[in-house]
């Protein structure tokens, strides 16, 4: 834990199917996730997946470790008073892209092959939602749309492409 823990400025949750991910924006504007929940969304079941999750990142998404290392030791205090380890925005995209790339190269471990379809669907949904967000920001439309429009768009896109596994993700 660092001497001065980053302060949470904004807090909310993202839904990926039936999984809720706590997300935060820190006072310095850095956005990200609660690491434990991010690891759970990817498929880790233990309560404190720390070192196992980092080994997984090193294998699947080594590029994510460089910016993850800058913040991975940051302990944040959530609005409910609990503390959590911060995982920066971009980790989810790096992981799903890493799984897809490993699969295409034939290097994905057999026990992780089940991750390919959900990761592909998450990646596409994130890309399309990001594209919509950029257009909304450029046009000013984000001030006119419902506050949960992007979350609903993401859910819709994910469910359209993932009906066979959506109960897990």
Task: Name each model feature, range by range.
Residues 1-169:
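Positively charged, aromatic-accented nucleic-acid-binding surfaces
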């Amino acid at each position: 834990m660092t001497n001065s823990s980053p302060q949470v400025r904004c807090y909310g949750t993202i839904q990926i199917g039936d999984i809720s991910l706590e997300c935060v924006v820190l006072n310095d504007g850095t956005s990200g996730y609660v690491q434990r929940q991010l690891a759970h969304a990817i498929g880790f079941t233990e309560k404190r997946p720390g070192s196992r999750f980092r080994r997984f990142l090193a294998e699947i998404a080594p590029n994510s470790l460089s910016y993850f290392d800058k913040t991975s030791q940051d302990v944040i205090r959530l609005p409910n008073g609990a503390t959590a380890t911060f995982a920066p925005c971009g980790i989810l995209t790096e992981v799903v892209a890493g799984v897809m790339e490993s699969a295409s190269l034939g290097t994905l471990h057999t026990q992780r092959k089940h991750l390919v379809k959900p990761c592909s669907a998450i990646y596409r949904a994130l890309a399309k939602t990001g594209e919509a967000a950029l257009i909304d920001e450029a046009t000013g439309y984000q001030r006119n749309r419902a506050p949960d429009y992007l979350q609903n768009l993401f859910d819709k896109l994910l469910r359209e492409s993932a009906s066979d596994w959506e109960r897990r993700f």
